[in-house]
Amino acid sequence: MEVLRQMLVHKANNSSMSTHKGLNRTEPVRMTYDHCELLGQLSTLNFSAASNTFSSGYNTTIKGSAPKTIQTVSSLFSKDITKAMSDIGNLVARMFPTASAERAAVILDITVFGFIADDLLEDAALSSDSEAFDKLHMLMLRLVRNDSFSEDEYPEYQNLIRFTRPIFTKFQALASRTLLNRFAYTYQEYLQGVQWEASLQPNQIPDFETCKNVKRHVGAWLCYFVLAEFAREIEVPITVRGNLEVQKFVTLACDIASYDNDTFLLKKEIRDGVVSNTIVITYLHGAKRLQDALDRILEMRKQTESEILAITSNLPHFGKDDKVAREYINALTCVIGGNFEWCSKTTRYQDPK
């Protein structure tokens, strides 16, 4: 990609980049971060170039389970946490259109848990207390793995435990042990990405590739891709998941979903001072205007979409596993297509009144 090549050249020429001896990594670039300047450009942004090729569908069974889940959340958590949950049923309905009513309900609950966990982790007081932050991380992993532990260890999170325990007990009952372990592993990777994102400072901007690689995990897309198998009641063998073309497809699908979230969250994240948005990073690494940075990311998304379509048109044959491989690819395209449709329409990402 020409845009990416230019970014990497810019990074290589930036004298403020420093490499630790013996370590294959670079420190974030220290550069001026003018929050007011970014805020001033929000009103002129044009998102009309955002488009999506991947279709999904709509799972009508979610309509029955979503209100009950939202009601339970409202009874256990603050209004600040629950205010953005009203539309979450539409996200799951679009990403997992073929899931049975029973499995769709579990996926909905897991997704709600993920949103609640995100809100808890974003608490400013928690992020400044590393011990408390790590404690919450450990609790979340224990809940996702459905481990046995004394709830007395977490008096401040009784409502989170009360809400989450039944979800992963049900998930464990329906999913294979392998699928459960894979989900727990991807969720642990996701939490590490969240921790990295929380460590960023406005005057320490990571390079574009580092940010993109981490955001493949921060967006929890690998978790959703495991849930896509669960929704279709399939388990993709390692011979398929380990195939280089399939691995490339998964990576590109993560990138597209991250680009979409960054696009539709852009205004909110700029207001919140978030610097890990790839559009913001593109702007801070040399784009003259925020609109230029947005257009670059949308162009990269378009090219990534073309690469995905090329892979799906030329998938290798997997013998007896060929049917499940193709269903897996179809399931992942539903996830990214449904995410785009939801992000572009949900009130969660609209301008505040």
Curated annotation (Swiss-Prot):
Chain positions recorded as Mg(2+) 1 binding sites: D118
Residues recorded as binding Mg(2+) 2, renumbered to this chain, are D118
Where along the sequence do coiled-coil regions lie? none
- The record's EC number reads 4.2.3.-
Sample GO molecular function, one term: metal ion binding
**Domain description:** The 2 conserved active-site motifs D(D/E)XX(D/E) and NSE are required for coordinating the divalent metal ions that stabilize the PPi moiety of the substrate.
Show where the record puts the motif WxxxxxRY motif: 342-349
Q: Which SUPFAM superfamilies match?
A: Terpenoid synthases
Protein family membership: Belongs to the terpene synthase family.
Free-text function comment from the UniProt entry:
Terpene synthase that may be involved in the production of volatile terpenoids. Does not show detectable terpene products with either farnesyl diphosphate (FPP) or geranyl diphosphate (GPP). P.polycephalum has a unique biology and these volatile terpenoids could function in internal communication of P.polycephalum, to mark the territory that have been explored, or they may be involved in chemotaxis.
> Which residues does the UniProt site feature Plays a critical role in the stabilization of intermediate cation point to?
F115
List the top taxonomic levels of the source. Eukaryota, Amoebozoa, Evosea, Eumycetozoa, Myxogastria
The prosthetic group or cofactor this protein requires is:
Mg(2+)
**Where would I look for the motif D(D/E)XX(D/E) motif in this sequence?**
118-122
Annotated motif NSE motif: location in the chain?
Answer: 261-269
Residues that hold Mg(2+) 3 according to the record: N261, E269
**An example Gene Ontology biological process:** terpene biosynthetic process
Keyword annotations from UniProtKB, A to Z: Lyase, Magnesium, Metal-binding
Pfam families linked to this entry: Terpene_syn_C_2
What is the name attached to this protein's record? Terpene synthase 3
Q: Which organism is it from?
A: Physarum polycephalum (Slime mold)
